[in-house]
Amino acid sequence: MGTVVSKKENLRNDAISSVAAKVRAARAFGEYLSHTRPENRNRSDHLLSDTFIGQETDSPDISRLNNNNSLQPYSQHTLIVKPSQEELQQGSQSAPLPTSSKRRLSVERSLSSEDQQNQRRTESSVKPARVYTITRERDMLGGQGSEESLELEVLKRTSEPSQINPPTGLRGSHHRGSQHRGNNGPTHQHHYGHAPMAQPLQSSGSTHNIRDWGSRRSRSREDCTPDCVACIRPHCQSQRSLDLDTSPHGGGKQHKKLERMYSEDRVSSEDREDHTNSWFPKENMFSFQTATTTMQAISNFRKHLRMVGSRRVKAQTFVDRKAKSFSRSWSDPTPVKPDSLHDSRDSGDLQASSGNLDEEDCDDVDWEEERELERVACEGDDFIPPKLMLISSKVPKAEYVPNIIRRDDPSIIPILYDHEHATFDDILEEIEKKLTAYRKGCKIWNMLIFCQGGPGHLYLLKNKVATFAKVEKEEGMMQFWKKLGRFMSLLNPEPNLIHIMGCYVLGNANGEKLFQNLKRLMKPHGIEFKSPLELSAQGKEMIEMYFDFRLYRLWKTRQHSKLHDYDDLL
């Protein structure tokens, strides 16, 4: 809607500027006549008197101009202004002169009668006169009477004039439609009783005087049209508007063309902006940061240098990671794996049952072998069962967690992994390396998973959320927990503990279901999951098992602070 209004305003301004140009041309033409024809110098000043908006037609200048035009004899080239009916009536009647002497009045009347006789003699002997008039056309702009254009027309008289001022009765009968309306109404008058042949000289005027024409108009063109056919001036075929088309179809086409050009320009500019910046990766665009966020970025960079999975950033670009990442939300339903390709249920069930029996036998054999290997590796009085800490970089200030662990317990093995770029295989590979470095062949007795999450779910990796449904249906999630179970100890007489810290998974019933499904996946190893609240007694016991309690409280108080005063922790 705003675009249509602005286009209409632009069309209106263009029309007004065109009319202003026409009036300026008319004024220049009048000045030219005043210089070239000295006898017309006084009358050329009033050529545009009827076009000015603020000038009243009843002013003394206009009435004196009309009287002069009726009294002075016509030369070969005469300039007059189209008068209105009231002006003609005033011109036909002798205007009273402000004199006190009747003798002076009689002398002036005798002079006027002699001038009229001389005028008739001159008209019979000279060539046809050219009369320059200024008319106002309403239909040139194609509007609803809001604006109007001026046209300077050169009218050539083709025959002898019958009378300069026709009788009042004839004017009243023929020109009822051309009543003078204020100082802006279009005037119409018989010039020597003939319809003229017009050759318009289109010109312009000042813009500030033209803007109020539409508001001063109160009647339509039909009210101003004379009744007689002879009074109607035929439109010239060469008369055209310089800026607008009067036909409605042409206007509509022009509107559509403007809209199309605007849309093409807008699209082309957007495409140019996109093409200029397309070569530069948008993820690397420099953004103005505060000092706090800059320091945080520096610390994160140092954190990624020693983080598991951060090396993958150099190997993969941002686009490849975005294309290969798991884009589904953790709350979306997981697609169910298709059934086996065997259509016969009987043969499939028999093969599955026989396969399960074979796998159970193999698992029993492997379980015994692994247990013996672990017993051999863990012999000695100096052996302390390892405690593994798996810390996600998604935890706020996670880079300081390795500095707040218990320093009197060498069995704690912290592993900080990259939440954004690491994979399950990277985590399992790092766990195997750390256990081998601690003691070859040993297994985990206690484990802490420090990550984000909530009631019923664990946010282990980016786009990898462990829920009770997804750990049963997503292949990657299932394989991770199964392989993680193989790193758990077989020598521990009690179930191996896996503490979940950083979130309260048991906040609803789905958390218990998640723990049950994870236990089933990690069999035959005995696993027990715990996720106590940190403020509870069990939570304090869990914290003291892995952390220095004083440093942990200091780290916890400054975990969400933007200040980097960790000198006590470092």
From Swiss-Prot:
UniProt keywords, alphabetically: Cell membrane, Cell projection, Cytoplasm, Cytoskeleton, Lipoprotein, Membrane, Myristate, Nucleus, Synapse, Synaptosome
Lipidation (N-myristoyl glycine): 2
Name recorded for this polypeptide: NMDA receptor synaptonuclear signaling and neuronal migration factor
Function: Stimulates outgrowth of olfactory axons and migration of hypophysiotropic gonadotropin-releasing hormone 3 (GnRH3) neurons. May couple NMDA-sensitive glutamate receptor signaling to the nucleus and trigger long-lasting changes in the cytoarchitecture of dendrites and spine synapse processes.
InterPro entries according to UniProt: NSMF
Range of residues in the leader sequence: none
Similarity remark: Belongs to the NSMF family.
Gene Ontology CC: cell cortex; cytoplasm; cytoskeleton; dendrite; nuclear matrix; nuclear membrane; nucleus; plasma membrane
Keyword Membrane: yes
Disordered as annotated region, ranges: 85-224, 239-278, 327-362
PANTHER family registered for this protein in UniProt: NMDA RECEPTOR SYNAPTONUCLEAR SIGNALING AND NEURONAL MIGRATION FACTOR
Annotated compartments: Nucleus; Nucleus envelope; Nucleus membrane; Nucleus matrix
Cysteine pairings via disulfide bonds: none
Composition skew (Basic and acidic residues), residue ranges: 209-224, 259-276, 339-348
One biological process term in Gene Ontology: positive regulation of neuron migration
